[in-house]
Amino acid sequence: MGSWTKRPPPETLARIREIISANADGAIEAHDLRTRHAGRMMFIDFHLVVPSSMSVAAAHQICDRLELAIKAEFPDALISIHVEPDDQAKHSGRKVHGEEKDAAVAGLEVPTP
């Protein structure tokens, strides 16, 4: 299927997970990480669960922080973050704060057909 379906190496995925974990303070959970390459561009998207009481502005600040951190290491990345309020989210159980933070994104990647 050409370069659109090319997955990044496992160490790249691990690094993206680490960046998300280190920069998602204020969020509850991250899940459904998907990555693909098309030429030099890497497309990264994932879902970020935030407290339902969080303002749009606060959620946007978290997303900005995540995008800047990811782009610092992957400047050719196009990043899409789908924000979900926790009372409507499809929870994965992968928390991104407290003691569970490191494990939160360990299984973030979801294979895509």
Spans of model-derived segments:
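Alpha-helical transmembrane segments and adjacent TM-loop junctions that form the membrane-embedded core
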Residues: M1-P113
